């Protein structure tokens, strides 16, 4: 089952998202970006869903960390502050999606599903690229150079 990390300082939102998503995904929660960093270092996640405004490090800093260390992991940003321009800026910084609070649970579910599908496609593409590359010197020696 795909793994989702839910990061929000508001326990009610964390619990609501957990209830919504835990039927189809293995969900873990963190109430700060710092705790999310620790979870990301310990386990692999298919999607990170994070609030942007939290005490300590922000969801924006978490986004930067994930983009740098786990570039194939989609990050969905949730915020009570923002507009279309703000959302586009976050997407340019590498967010997979931006959801404005208060959000519809249906919209959250669809966004997470799309992110999981995106992650799955990326993993398949990476495996295909790895299969095309020579795995060792013997395999590399089997490649032929053709002069035209």
Question: What feature does the model see in each segment?
Answer:
Residues 85, 103-112:
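C-terminal output helix
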Residues 117-148:
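CheY-like receiver
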Residues 44-49:
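Active-site beta3 strand of CheY-like receiver
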Residues 54:
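Receiver (REC) domain active-site loop signature in two-component systems and cognate sites
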Residues 32-35, 58-61:
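Acidic catalytic/metal-coordinating carboxylates
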Residues 11-28:
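Two-component/phosphorelay signaling modules centered on CheY-like receiver
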């Amino acid at each position: 089952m795909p793994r989702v990390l839910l990061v929000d300082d508001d326990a009610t939102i964390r619990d609501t998202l957990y209830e919504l998503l835990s039927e189809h995904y293995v969900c873990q929660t963190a109430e700060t970006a710092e705790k999310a960093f620790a979870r990301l270092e310990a386990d692999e996640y298919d999607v990170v869903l994070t609030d942007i405004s939290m005490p300590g490090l922000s969801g924006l800093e978490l986004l930067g960390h994930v983009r740098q260390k786990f570039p194939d992991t989609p990050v969905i940003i949730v915020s009570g502050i923002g507009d279309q321009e703000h959302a586009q800026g976050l997407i340019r910084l590498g967010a997979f999606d931006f959801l404005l609070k208060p959000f519809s649970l249906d919209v959250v579910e669809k966004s997470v599903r799309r992110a999981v599908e995106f992650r799955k496609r990326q993993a398949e593409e990476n495996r295909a690229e790895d299969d095309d590359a020579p795995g060792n010197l013997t395999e590399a020696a089997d490649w032929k150079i053709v002069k035209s």
